[in-house]
Amino acid sequence: MKLRVKFSKHGVLRFIGHLDVMRYFQKAIRRAGIDIAYTTGFSPHQVMSFAAPLGLGLESNGEYMDIEVNSLTSSPDFINALNAQMVDGIRILEARLLPDNAKNAMASVAAARYTVAFRKGYEPVFLTEAVVDDFFGQSEIIVTKQTKKGETTFDMKPFLFACAFDDAQNTLTLIVDASSAGNIKPSLAVKAIYDRNHAEFNDYALLITREETYLNAGTQEVPRLEPLGFIGSDFG
Amino acid sequence: MRTLALSDDILLKVEKPARYIGNEVNSVMKDKDHVDIRFAMCFPDVYEIGMSHLGIQILYDMFNRYEDTWCERVYSPWPDLDSVMRERNIPLFALESQEPIKTFDFLGITIQYEMCYTNILQILDLSKIPFHACDRDWDCPIVIGGGPCAYNPEPIADFFDIFYIGEGETQYRPLLDLYKACKKEGCSRTEFLIRAAQLPGLYVPQFYEVTYREDNTIASFTPTVSGIPGTITKELVTDITDTTYPEKPVVPFIKCTQDRVVLEIQRGCIRGCRFCQAGQLYRPVRERDADSLKEYAIKMLDNTGYEEISLSSLSSSDYSRLEELVNFLIESCNEKKVNISLPSLRIDSFSLDVMEKVQDVKKSSLTFAPEAGSQRLRNVINKGLTEEVILEGATLAFAGGWNRVKLYFMLGLPTETDEDIRGIAELSDKIAMAYYDTVPKEKRNGRVQIVASTSFFVPKPFTPFQWAPQCTKEQFLEKAYTTKRAIMEQLNQKSIKYNWHEADASVMEGILARGDRRLCEPILRAYQKGCIFDAWGEYYRHDVWTETFAECGIDTSFYTTRQRGLDEIFPWDFIDCGVTKAFLKSEWKNALDERVTKNCKEQCNACGAARFGCGICTVPRITNL
């Protein structure tokens, strides 16, 4: 049976990298006594996969991992058992049973929604609702990003699904492509806004929270973003 | 949520920020307003090394069981953070509370190897604690050192208020009670230290005076305060089954050197290898009861979620109920999908059988530590491993599918000749030969892989070799070349790979290991010139050390290559580790006579440890007087 587990990651957990979070969960699952399935072979390991790696320094309310279990009682039992093993900064939010034919978490990821706040003393004075609307209203947004092979320049617009500024909260909300094929880092989009307004960009100014990770419940042509747990169901 | 000592911009800039944030599973948080004593426990090396150390885990657990004490951890900031902390004047902090070390009552430093001495100064410096104990007042924590290097604390004597000689489980409670009483009475720091110096096993260096002869050896070593002992006897736990052991060890987020549950099955060793300091310091051998170990194993696995468990001891094969314990672990670990790692096991049919059950034979390799290449030299060092036993073990293993062998040797052992060194190559060749004789061509999976590694021998205090001259760097390197050439001459040389260690650091280790108080000054100067992380090849600066010794007018050969007289007073002679100097002397003589001494299970050799009245010493055996 495949489960999709949603969790949040805050506070000092921002400084724990993706691979270490995986190692952390492998141990937590053992401590919680969850009847997880193991691969066969000489060095069996837990059947577990994560949706989308979260960069160092980012917080999240919408992380997902898939695990396979041999038996289970109920969603609340599972959540409570695992939460009893969590350290400060990481909470299990939901656990949903997946249909047998579900694609794994990583392959399912289509998009992610981020909230970008600004560190004290680094608030951009130029940012307003109008400035951001103007930015998002462009027909193409040419950006340059660093890759392993060097720099590439491309049009970000097709990968940027929503972009809005909240004047009252002084926060940006972004929905960007987070699939393995077209993943956009939120800071790249924010940098493009700064660049368009000739403002000096500093990565450190941003306090980024991933709010949700989405799959595409619609079609290629008419996408419909739903949280990654959408295809699962509560159990027990 | 806790406030971190380091700001986000620093944590995002340094390598592995998880080293500095605490919050790990099973780390202990307490309300600082509800404890009397704040204890910072330090391993003066990087987090991943320090977190792998069992001793600290035991003491961390013990202290935190005390309701009036909160024990936290601190490790050496890696050079990247070190420079940021200096630049921005950030004081060193403990992982749990993230509060400055200077505000603690105690700073306990475990001293596991000589090459960490400058890191101790880094810890003091970043904590803003004066380097010299005599310059500290009640604004500073009591700095207390322990661990194997505390058995010759003299090269770092100036930097510590107290050294704790021996096993930590016994005297900390009385020390903490004394501290509380002294604080209540409003005692001076000096008064507290005088009273601490009267507790068993505690050494307060500032109350002892050393005088030297013209030849630079020690003339006298005497207490300067009345009522404190001239000899410090090591502390030890007589019944180690009955002592505390961490059921819930801290589980780090990042991968550490020791990434598993560690079960200490016994302390001490019956073997008496003459180069080995641990084998003498931790006598007598004391076993933990197998039934309680089984319970610990299950609890610790359940409480940590580790995927692997390892047995810890100096020589696991000598544990009397090993087979029963290992079979229990195999059974319960199989259920839990947990691996078992079994270091320091003698290769025989039992261990091969176990390894076959718990490890992937194709991936694992066999390890032998003959330490010396010839039987003659193995007799000198009292390493009771014969060529016959090695070849038998290897043949068994080859028949069982293994085809990789690791061999560990030392170069520069007392009385070593080129003939002994060639023995390393010849033994390696014979093992290769055994493979080709045992495994028929069609069953071979390529060539047998033999890796022979040599380290350079460093004589240590409290061993029979404490009188032995150490080799010079040139001699060391010559010996490594001789080994290399001898291996090249072997028939199966293509199956043998040879590794040797760097020689400079071994010479340095030798200076510090048998050093005296006069080394405090060059150690501090070398630190002030930027030496830290000397145990890390990439940071070790031999040129700076050499220059510093010269500036301080110290002839380092006095500590290394000099032939020591049998009646010389050593800097560590004021410590009584149980084993007597007379016994070590007779062992030194036995070594030169190439005479083997039986192990503690075969007969009692009257080493002196029997006076502790515990462990193997209470088992009736023949006594050799």
Can you name each region flagged by the protein language model?
Chain A
Residues 71-75, 121-123, 179:
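Helix N-cap motif at beta-to-alpha junctions
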Residues 38-69:
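Short, charge-patterned binding micro-sites
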Residues 2-8, 113-118:
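Active-site-flanking beta-strand signature of metal-NTP-handling nucleotidyl enzymes
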Residues 6-8, 12, 16, 20:
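Extended, well-folded interaction surfaces typified by the phenylalanyl-tRNA synthetase beta subunit core
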Residues 133-236:
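Core RNA-modification/binding signature centered on pseudouridine synthases
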Residues 61-115:
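Ordered, amphipathic secondary-structure segments that act as subunit-interaction surfaces
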Residues 77-86, 127-136, 189-190:
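Short amphipathic alpha-helices in soluble, non-transmembrane regions
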